[in-house]
Amino acid sequence: MAVLKQPQHHHGKHGGRSFYQLIAYLMLTSRLDNYGMLFTSFGGAGIYKSQDYTSTTSQASILRLAGLCTAHCVLLGAAGNTWNDWMDRDIDSKVARTKDRPLASGKISSGEAFTWMAFLYSTSVGMLKAMLGDRNVWPFMVPLTAIILVYPLGKRPIARKLRIYPQYLLGIAVGYPTMYGWAAVYGPCMPISEILHRCVPLWIFLFFWSFYANTSYSYQDVEDDRKMKVNSAYNLAGKRIRALLAILASIALSTIPFVLRPFSSAWLWLSWVGAWVPGIIQQLLSFDPSKPESGGVLHLSTVKLGLWTVFACTLELYLSNRAVI
């Protein structure tokens, strides 16, 4: 749900448009004005300082790296949103909630969108280079970039026939930045295979969390999407959408002990379990399948849980020499 208001004066498709209006439209296209972008900030929580692996990285450095990781995730996510809107512009123009998006309504051109996307992408790469130092960023960037490019195709009917839903791709992308944290803290001394092994629990948690949240968010468009045969996970669930959400949430919650096991921290257990379990229960009870708009409320609630978790992990960094950000 956008925070910025659409500029109210339109002069054709592009004529008479001010520079401010262009920037506002580009911001809307990339969702830099959207609370959903805060989702990517949880990727910064992938920066672990493990108790069983030697690291000389200071707490201040970890905070700096977390900030760079968050900036990278937000900028790359914004570039991905721009790409998604360009790919979906014809679909979006026929959906009530998205028909006024700048690309769908013709308020900005494809050239303007691609220029903006290139700027966002290149800036995100720069942030990652600053974060990883001497390490080559492209072994990390290429797979994630490929996922972002393919993501819009997951909504097409052919993907539905293959049982591939866009939430699969989104979940992988949201969890991917956990690898950056390990690579930044431990540097070139840790091979990518070892980084991946250590990130698996948090990655699985983020995969099912984002699957759960995006399914509820997309459910807002269920009526229009079904008419156009847009592929999404709620098509798999049908009338059992609440049951699907409950299953996804349960899997996400069940991974929390594996995420926290390396850390002997009562605070992390209390702050995670004490917030997530009642939070998820409240979300599922308040979700009403007969009111698609309730999916947006659920999604916002999950973002708040994510932000709370980032705060809790940041506080743990100050409470212990074994830290998670």
Swiss-Prot record:
Biotech use, per record: Compounds in the chrodrimanin family such as chrodrimanin A or verruculide A exhibit strong inhibitory activities against protein tyrosine phosphatase 1B (PTP1B) and therefore, they could potentially be developed into drugs for the treatment of type 2 diabetes or obesity. Furthermore, chrodrimanin B, the end product of the pathway involving chrodrimanin A or verruculide A, does not exhibit the PTP1B inhibitory activity, while it functions as a potent blocker of insect GABA-gated chloride channels.
Cofactors required: Mg(2+)
EC number: 2.5.1.-
Pathway connected to this protein: Secondary metabolite biosynthesis; terpenoid biosynthesis
Keyword Calcium: no
Enzyme class, broadest EC rank: transferase
Record-annotated membrane-spanning stretches: 60-80, 113-133, 138-158, 169-189, 192-212, 243-263, 267-287, 295-315
Function according to Swiss-Prot or TrEMBL: 6-hydroxymellein 5-farnesyltransferase; part of the gene cluster that mediates the biosynthesis of chrodrimanin B, a meroterpenoid that acts as a potent blocker of insect GABA-gated chloride channels. The first step of the pathway is the biosynthesis of 6-hydroxymellein by the polyketide synthase cdmE. The prenyltransferase cdmH acts as a 6-hydroxymellein 5-farnesyltransferase and produces the hydrophobic metabolite verruculide C. The FAD-dependent monooxygenase cdmI further converts verruculide C into verruculide B.
Assigned protein family: Belongs to the UbiA prenyltransferase family.
Name by which UniProt lists this protein: 6-hydroxymellein 5-farnesyltransferase cdmH
Organism: Talaromyces verruculosus
Name of the gene encoding the protein in the UniProt record: cdmH
